Every structure is written in C-alpha cells, then in structure tokens.
C-alpha cells in the first residue's frame, strides 16, 4: 500500500525487491537439485547423464590403454602380476565411478546440503530479516517541500537503481550455482572416466575439486546471509536532523548500499572464497 509520497514509495519498492530476493535465496539454498523448479530440469539432466555413460565407457578404455602405454615401459613389465593387478583394480574402480557417478555426485551434494541446514538451524533464523525504511527517515522525507524535494528525487532514483541491480546480481549468482550443479552432474561420466589411466587421472581430480567447491558454495552464501541479517537488524543510524533532507537520505542510502554490497560481494565470490579456504583451486 502506498504511503502517498513518491520518494518513500520508490525506496520501499526497491527494498521490497531486495527483501523478496533475499527470501528467495533463503529458500533456494535449502532446495535440492531434484526438487528445483518441480524436478523437470533434473529429469532432463538424468537422461543426459545416462546418454553420456556410453561415451564415458569408450573414454574409459581409451584412458586405460593410454595409461598402460605410458606407465609400462614394455610388454614384459605388463606381464608382472603386481603391475597387471594394479591396472585391473584401477580400471574396475574407474568403471564403477562412471556407472555410479550420479549417485556419487548426489551423495556429495547431500553432505554439503546437510552442512547448510546445520548452519541455518544453528543461526536461529527461520527467515531473513526484512530491510525497511526507519520511521524517522520517512518523516524527514514527508516534511520536505516541493522545491527541496527535487534533489531527493535524484538521490532516490540513484539509490533505488543500485538496490535493484544488486538484487538481480545476487539472485542470478545463486541461480548460476544450480546451473553449474546441473552441468557438472550431466557430464560426470566423462571426467570420471579419466581415472582409468594414471596420467589422465588429474582431469578427474580437478573435476571432483570443482564439484566440491560448487556444493560448498551454499555454506558461504548462507553464512553471508546470516551476517547481513545481523546488520539488517541494526539499520544505519539517521544522520543529524539539522542537515538537509537530501543529505540525510543520501547518507542513509549510501550506508545501506554499502552493507548490501558486502553481502552481494560475498555471494558473488563464494566460489573463490571456498576454493581459497579449502584449497580446492
């Protein structure tokens, strides 16, 4: 419901956009890929994964032969029981990884999702704290005359634009995490087939590290939201009321946008943060 003041309504509209995206993130971060958007996307990914298993098995043989050729200097060395047994075990394990890659990936995601749920429960938050305009600021804006309100229009438009852009960047980053999960899960038979050969196994190791980082991004995102919620519970203080109304609003909006930038930056860099902290880079 409008307040009857265009400036207040414009700021409230931007904050409603921000609060809505935060609530959506809080819900998305606890959603599994299987139930995301009704599970329709997941069904397509499962079909693609099944189709790529044939390619994975073909690469399995190729990587195995390449590994045997590079690690064994001659056919005589290959005839040694310990060498042949080692190659056989590697091939069997790689074949199992290709066959059960989907189960391995979903299992790893469930572990990470359990960590996210634990962080949410430990924080004591059932939902994100909404960011609202203080009553004092609303009173200052409503008491401004028409001529003096002209600078406020510019400040309000600029601040609202920043808040809208930050909201979109934040939610797009969270959605991109789901897309990365889907892409990694779809192609999992191909990189896991590289474990059949010792020289090519670095491909599989790099893939597993990347997938672990994608799963653990949720922990960083939820921690950033919890920290911001604590900031939101103590909104920026209103500056000296003897200042011009435009200055008071600009100081408030500037501090509010700074807090939002911290959250968006943490969410945007969640992949980099988790790679640096866990050594997954």
Q: What is each of the regions a protein language model found here?
A:
Residues 59-95, 187-201:
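Hydrophobic transmembrane alpha-helix segments characteristic of membrane transport
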Residues 1-59:
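Binding/recognition "hotspot" determinant
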Residues 45-53, 85-89, 93, 142-146, ...:
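Alpha-helical membrane-interface segments at transmembrane helix boundaries
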Residues 95-187, 221, 225-278:
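Non-cytosolic segments of integral membrane proteins
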């Amino acid at each position: 419901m409008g307040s009857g003041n265009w400036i207040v309504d414009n700021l409230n509209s931007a904050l409603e956009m921000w609060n809505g995206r935060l609530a959506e993130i809080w819900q998305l971060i606890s959603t599994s890929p299987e139930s995301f958007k009704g599970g329709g996307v997941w069904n397509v990914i499962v079909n693609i994964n099944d189709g790529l298993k044939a390619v994975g098995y073909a690469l399995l043989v190729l990587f195995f032969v390449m590994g045997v050729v590079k690690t064994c200097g001659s056919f005589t060395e290959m005839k040694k029981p310990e060498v042949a047994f080692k190659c056989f075990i590697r091939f069997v394990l790689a074949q199992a990884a290709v066959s059960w890659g989907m189960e391995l990936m979903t299992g790893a995601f469930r572990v990470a999702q359990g960590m996210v749920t634990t962080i949410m429960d430990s924080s004591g938050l059932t939902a994100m704290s909404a960011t609202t305009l203080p009553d004092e600021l609303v009173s200052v804006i409503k008491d401004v005359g028409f001529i003096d309100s002209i600078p406020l229009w510019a400040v309000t438009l600029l601040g609202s634009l920043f808040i809208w852009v930050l909201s979109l960047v934040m939610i797009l980053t969270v959605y991109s995490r789901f897309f990365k999960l889907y892409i990694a899960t779809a192609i999992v038979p191909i990189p896991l087939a590289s474990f059949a050969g010792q020289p090519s196994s670095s491909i599989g190791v790099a893939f597993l590290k990347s997938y672990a980082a994608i799963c653990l991004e949720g922990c960083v995102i939820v921690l950033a939201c919890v920290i911001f919620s604590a900031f939101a519970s103590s909104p920026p203080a209103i500056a000296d009321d003897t200042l011009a109304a435009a200055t008071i609003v600009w100081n408030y909006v500037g501090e509010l946008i700074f807090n939002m930038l911290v959250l968006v930056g943490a969410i945007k860099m969640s992949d980099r943060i988790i790679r640096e902290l866990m050594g997954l880079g």
